[in-house]
Amino acid sequence: MAHPASNLPPVLRPEHPPVRALDDLAARFGTSTRGETDGVTLTGVTLATADLRPGEAFVAIQGVNRHGAEFAAQAAEKGAVAVVTDAAGADIAAGSGLPIVIVDSPRAVLGDLSAWVYGTGADDELPLLFGTTGTNGKTSVSHLLEGILNQLGVVTGLSSTAERHIAGQVIVSRLTTPEASEFHALLALMRERGVEAVAVEVSAQALSRHRVDGLMFDVAGFTNLSHDHLDDYADMREYFEAKLQLFHPDRSRRGVVSLDSSAGAEVAARSEVPVVTVICPAIAADPDAAADWTVEILEERQDGTTFRLAGPDGRSLTTVVPTIGRHMAANAGPAIVMLLEGGYAWESFVAALDGGRIEAYLPGRTERVSGERGPAVYVDFGHSPDAFEKTLAAVRHVTPGKVLFVMGADGDRDATKRLDMGRTGAEGSDIFIVTDHHPRFEEPDSIRATLLEGARRAGTPTELHEYSPPERAILEAVKLVGEGDAILWCGPGHQDYRDIRGVRTPYSARELSRRALRDAGWPVPEPHWPVPYPDDDTPLSDPTRDWR
């Protein structure tokens, strides 16, 4: 797959969108109108004036600080044919010269409205949709779904935190789950290009904020639940209830639920659609829980994890997931079962996978960025205590020497997990380096101090270090390890920027790691990820070079 040259997501629209009448839109979704709507037609909808194309309707919602209707005149200049907004927005947009359709809640109606505009609703002819939710593993399951489907000869689409794919074309991703208008346009484009099945990562926020409204998932998957996102939700119960929404007949037809976390049993019990269950006893909270399918870990190596998937009627296959970690095998098993529930024949999985391996690339998910010699260096997107615990255990299992852990925490995000993040990092490593991640508008010194306090509370003999610049952190990390040792850098994963006081600066933990190894004299592979830095041989440690 070719990576995009720009790190800005493109505006994606179907090449041949349906033409809809504004009067029909108003009749279906509106409570009233202002201005002349007769004879007005539209070919798309968007929330963002920056993405608006001529002939589209601009949907204006109330934001945190401003109402989107304040940009109605700008939308008109870019060729918008109408504004869809609430009563307050209609008053603000009155001077734009555009006809206005008033709805009770533009955010709540956007999904169904977009599905109607693009013909991507539950009753329309679409690719099969596989949606995965859970705290950890959503991205991995989505990429594994895509990889397995490709091995079955299926033309695929993907929407994940890391990337979006349309039949092999790679597109930059910014949100785990795109806004509803963007997603329905993407799905319509995928349909035009012959995509037969789509793997979708569905966040709790997407469910709460109506981003997947108007979609019908053929199969929904649940991975696990652990401490995260309490900046968005009052408590873990509210967070759980948000994810449970995916298992409702308005959103999915069938479900596959992992019982590895204690929340899985409740999802299975309360699901309003038929579900089958999967368990990996090697990592499950209750390894004796009864499930329809079982993932048995057979071998863990640096080049992959071998597992056996066994289920009803004596069905069984043995294959390899191409990353380290029992938790990755625990992601792969449900991915296979989701596809089976989607209608693909068991015999096709046996032919493609049994005795072989899953061919999937998981960007920034326990991704090895080092060469064959020297310390093994892995970069991961994990940013929760549970993710740290599982990933550190995976690295420890395949590492004969020391394990060095590098991490930072997001600013302006759930701060209640930081002490546990620090504690888990110290418990799972021999050397622990705390650095900066996305400080956003928080003081990075304060973030690091909390992480280090958590590390000290672990009471382990772990060697602790603190370096504010990530560039310095990885340089020092490489100095502290050698052949047979491993570095795990958690947090950045696939990301190509850092957010510092609202400014996104080019950044790649994968490339920084590769160059730090190169500067230390270790052989390194060529990058197979976008490189946001100058492509030259200047050492990372050169004081004249500002890599940030």
Model-derived regions: residue spans:
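ATP-dependent carboxylate-amine ligase
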Residues: M1-R34, P54-A57, H67, G314, ...
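Short, basic phosphate-binding NTP loop
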Residues: A2-T133, V141-L152, A290-A291, R301, ...
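Residue-level signal for inorganic ion chemistry
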Residues: L25, E56, A75, L113, ...
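Short, hydrophobic beta-strand segments that form beta-sheet elements in well-ordered domains
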Residues: G44-V45, G79-D86, V200, G255-S258, ...
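Receiver (REC) domain switch/active-site residues of two-component response regulators
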Residues: V81, D218, D430
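Short secondary-structure boundary segments
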Residues: T85-A88, V202, N224, L259, ...
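Acidic, Mg2+-coordinating active-site environments of NTP-dependent enzymes
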Residues: A90-G95, S208, F217-A376, G454-T460, ...
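Phosphate-binding loop of NTP-binding sites
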Residues: V109-L259, A263-P274, T399, V524, ...
